[in-house]
Amino acid sequence: MTVFAKRDNGKGARASRMVQSGAIFALAATTYLVSPQIAQAQSYRFDQVAIEGNQRIEPRTILTYAGIGRGEAVTAGELNDAYQRLQGSGLFEKVELKPQGGTLVIAVQEFPTVNVVAFEGNDRIKDDVLQGLIKTQSRKIYSPAAVEADAALITKGYSDIGRMAATVTPKVIRREGNRVDVAFEITEGKVTEIERLSFTGNRAYSDRRLRNVLNTKQAGFFRALVQRDTLVPERLEYDTQLLTDFYRSRGYVDVKVKGISSDYTRERDAFFVTFNIEEGQSFKFGDVSVISEVEGVDPAEYEKQIKIRSGVTYSPTAVDNVITRMEGVALKQGLNFITVEPRVVRNERDLTLDVQFVLTRGPKVFVERIDIEGNTTTLDRVIRRQFKTVEGDPFNPREIRNAAERVRALGYFANADVQTKRGNNPDQVVVDVNVEEQPTGSFGIGASYGADQGVGLNLSLAEDNFLGRGQRMAVAIATAGDEQNNSITFVEPYLFGRDLQFGINLQNSKSDNSNAFYQTRVTSFSPSLTFPISEQGRLSLRYTLKSDKMFNVGKDENDDGNYTGSSPILKADELVGSQLTSGVGYTYSYDTRVNALDPNTNFKFSFGQDFNGLGGDIESIVTKAEVIGQTKVMQEEVTLTGQLQGGAVTMLNGGRSRLLDRFSGNGLIRGFEAWGYGPRDQSHSLTVSDGLGGNYFISAKMDAQFPIGLPEEYGVTGGLFMDIGSVWGLDDTAGVGGAEVDDSLIWRSSVGFSIYWTTPVGPLRLNFSKALMKEDYDKERNFDLTVSTKF
């Protein structure tokens, strides 16, 4: 291209100066050249500027980009600048600057309009998904740079699903009317899996243990179903953070993931990924103290917030929890702008860290406002209630970070970014919350199997963010054999804007147990309120209205309803007919998994009672308690679990308990069938002897889960277990012919081994058990398989 300009010599003579087109096109390669023949000091003047070739772009827009007005003196360099601005605008395919006498003609050829965007060769990713990745759209202006960028985005999209060999070639087809069709020709290639995940530098933990920490998985038996066994750079970055957090929570404060290498296999169809770790040493807490650098603040009042003991493995989470509690105490005392700074002193000799919590006065900065963007469905208040800080409160960076984590933990957003910026005044900040919505509803079609119920079908429809209010609504239908259980659940997690959970549960069930000759039907309605009463303790209050009925006692529904005979205890339950139960109850739970100080040891305790008799037919007190403890040993390769449960039903005002009121013992002791142990009418005149359940139960279960030498990508581990317990106690022990039914406490126990198989469609467990302590009339089961799945 050649640009001619009229030189300002006072006589109107024409002089030509050439700006080489190669110099101008070199701008695209970020190199700017100017012909040495042009003297930058020379100036030119155009009386008029004419525009040619524009169809959609307004002349004023072109003049604005050119920056040359009528009668203005311009240099050759300024002409170059005008060209570059026009060409760099992305609006024109070609640009020419042509002088004609005293007129500068700007001739442009606009980029064509995109007529159709098409994708060819794509099977794994559908057209609508690919269209959402790219910028080029129908009826928009065609841009070569944008099309190339879109090809790269499509390639990345395939890379994210493990198809590293995918190639994308854009094709542009010219059409009449200055239009083009853009086609992306895609060669998807094969999935490039991660064949092996390995580690170097790890001495404290095995590769097997560290692989369980990672979000990325290595290809295994179900490689066709697993989506996390492909090489995704962003996922590996997340894995780096997971590894770092894992080590630091176990006292390795100096841990570093020094690098990640990914190498092709010899066949170039998979990757070997290796994490290079520098562990360092594991530290424990040394001396832990608190001092105050704020006049008038007594540190003794804050010492009780220290829940850390010397000699315990160092954990950043434990330190953060103490800081949060101390700053909360300061706020309750009306001490604003008090911050807690942890000062750590290393003791290399004994590998301890002395932590001194220092109360200091921070800068007086206030929160001007909290701006929330990106929430197209979720209401602002759902996000805002995750912040304990409101407009006008003192600014606390740690609280803002904690609030950001709470927003992410909701599960409503694919991404949640929380940043702060300066407000209108130097002592104010604005908190910007930018979220990206993600689907929160789910439809589940599931299958289940149990030795008692056989094969079952489960249907569920759930919405975790109902109407964008943060509420949960779920409908579930479960069938197994002749049993059916339907339920509707609604949960409002923040009633009245407080940490007060309100729930309603409606349930209807019908059972025809294949191991017993009777049927039951239960319908219940139960609203509840749950709220925290301590950092790790919660209290749940509930009301329950229930109608239940027992019928067809002693009739074999599989044999045309013939009467087989049954215990008079069960016949009495049938004679009372449908019964209404109305009562209130509570459950207190204490769970150390909330803000856990030790990641390897967890403890949960719960105790609850139901007081029935607020109207209805049943007057009773039902009490249940449970303790569960879990720890990991042998470099966290072996998981030990212990569980202790107990319960009691106390009938009031001389009432007798029915089978529907008593405990069945199902699942408490492995090695026995449902209703397979406990009181039983053993009269020889009965064709069938059904279990009667008991007013009391106790159970202790001990499990050990460990690797059995198989590659962990198979997801198979082994386990040993031992159970002991009993179900006992009846209000009416008169059996057939007045014979006494033995309802005393008789211990049962069993041992066995388990095979755990974690599959992409759900966890599967096979139990092989042997009853050790039993009665002759007990019904044993030596094998049990359970699986629960969604697909």
Task: Mark where each language-model region is.
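Transmembrane beta-strand segments that form the barrel wall of outer-membrane beta-barrel proteins
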Residues: 387, 420, 440-449, 457-480, ...
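Repeated loop/turn-to-beta-strand initiation elements of outer-membrane beta-barrel proteins
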Residues: 413-414, 441-443, 454, 466-473, ...
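Periplasmic polypeptide-binding modules associated with outer-membrane biogenesis and secretion
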Residues: 2-19, 38-451, 460, 474-494, ...
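C-terminal outer-membrane beta-barrel translocator/porin domains of Gram-negative envelope proteins
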Residues: 409, 424, 442, 450, ...
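Outer-membrane beta-barrel "beta-signal"
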Residues: 461, 585, 753-762, 780-791
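Transmembrane beta-barrel architecture of outer-membrane proteins
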Residues: 455, 479, 484-486, 506-512, ...
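Transmembrane beta-barrel wall of Gram-negative outer-membrane proteins
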Residues: 486-578
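Solvent-exposed loop/turn segments connecting transmembrane beta-strands
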Residues: 448-456, 475-486, 513-520, 578, ...
